[in-house]
Amino acid sequence: MTADRPALRTGDRDTRLSFGSNLSSFTDYLRGHAPELLPENRIGHRSHSTRGGDGMESGDLAPHGTTIVALTYKGGVLLAGDRRATQGNLIASRDVEKVYVTDEYSAAGIAGTAGIAIELVRLFAVELEHYEKIEGVPLTFDGKANRLASMVRGNLGAAMQGLAVVPLLVGYDLDADDESRAGRIVSYDVVGGRYEERAGYHAVGSGSLFAKSALKKIYSPDSDEETALRAAIESLYDAADDDSATGGPDLTRGIYPTAVTITQAGAVHVSEETTSELARRIVAERTEQGGSAR
């Protein structure tokens, strides 16, 4: 042993080994070294009851995101969401961003408790970037889906208090045999169960029942990107028509759904100009038809 290199103490060795074992997972590193920074640990200590101390439901205490839709099309997949967040029977926000690009070939939408969900998806994006920097290769789509499932499972304690987070993950699978069918959709339950959605479309949130009913009638797996985007916006319009927690196109304030498309070229945010034009066209057509679909 040299004089300028002191002996490694047992505690130091254990720390280094612990650090190295979870090095590729930024979430695991936070859990071991700064657990208070994880989304599920930033809500404060509350009773395990689903009611607040003043008799309010926990859903009334924090804004909730509502409806997200996803659908595959020939050569890609898209994710779209409305902009409304509710707090009990009030509109907490009219222009929440619920759709996020998480890396070059994936995106996630959020439904549930908005504050926790936004932090969770942002942490997920850091997780993917951290893994690629450490390992030198990006995670496969299945790897991404499993990582997000683990993070949702970590929020179980908050979910049992009524502060649930339900993301919707989409991505372009670079390992797919058929490039025209490489778009994939994965949904989750509040305990972290992951489910591959093979119908080609899915929706989560309070308006999901109405959105999926609309997509069932107009969805085609062979549609192009523009047709798929129109179907997504139309399904959100139908959801908003029946679900008060889902916000439809707001022509007065200029607030429209947001969307992300993912193809072999990567993930791209759809411009507001494109979504607003489609939304205005749909509203005009519905107005001519007395509010009913074509």
From Swiss-Prot:
Provide the protein's localization: Cytoplasm
Report the pathway entry. Protein degradation; proteasomal Pup-dependent pathway
Q: How is its activity regulated?
A: The formation of the proteasomal ATPase ARC-20S proteasome complex, likely via the docking of the C-termini of ARC into the intersubunit pockets in the alpha-rings, may trigger opening of the gate for substrate entry. Interconversion between the open-gate and close-gate conformations leads to a dynamic regulation of the 20S proteasome proteolysis activity.
Task: Name a GO molecular-function annotation.
Answer: endopeptidase activity
A cellular-component GO term for this protein: cytoplasm
Which leading EC class covers this enzyme?
hydrolase
**Record-linked SUPFAM superfamilies:** N-terminal nucleophile aminohydrolases (Ntn hydrolases)
Instruction: Return the Gene3D superfamilies for the record.
Output: Glutamine Phosphoribosylpyrophosphate, subunit 1, domain 1
Note the SS bond partners.
Answer: none
Q: What is its EC number?
A: 3.4.25.1
Which reactions does this protein catalyse? Cleavage of peptide bonds with very broad specificity
* GO BP annotation list: modification-dependent protein catabolic process; proteasomal protein catabolic process
Q: Where is the active site?
A: T66 (nucleophile)
Pro-region residues? 1-65
Q: Which UniProt keywords apply?
A: Autocatalytic cleavage, Cytoplasm, Hydrolase, Protease, Proteasome, Threonine protease, Zymogen
Name where it mostly resides. cytoplasm
InterPro entries according to UniProt? Ntn_hydrolases_N (IPR029055), Proteasome_sua/b (IPR001353), Proteasome_suB-type (IPR023333), PSB_actinobac (IPR022483)
Domain free text: In contrast to M.tuberculosis, the propeptide is required for correct proteasome folding and assembly. The propeptide is positioned strategically at the region where it can act as an assembly-promoting factor by linking its own beta-subunit to two adjacent alpha-subunits at the same time.
Q: Can you tell me which family this protein belongs to?
A: Belongs to the peptidase T1B family.
What functional role does this protein have?
Answer: Component of the proteasome core, a large protease complex with broad specificity involved in protein degradation. The R.erythropolis proteasomes are able to cleave oligopeptides after Tyr, Phe and Leu, very poorly after Arg but not after Glu. Thus, displays chymotrypsin-like activity, low trypsin-like activity but no caspase-like activity.
Q: What is known about its subunit structure?
A: The 20S proteasome core is composed of 14 alpha and 14 beta subunits that assemble into four stacked heptameric rings, resulting in a barrel-shaped structure. The two inner rings, each composed of seven catalytic beta subunits, are sandwiched by two outer rings, each composed of seven alpha subunits. All four combinations of alpha- and beta-subunits (beta2-alpha1, beta2-alpha2, beta1-alpha2 and beta1-alpha1) yield fully assembled and proteolytically active proteasomes. The catalytic chamber with the active sites is on the inside of the barrel.
Instruction: Kindly provide the name given to this protein in its UniProt entry.
Output: Proteasome subunit beta 1
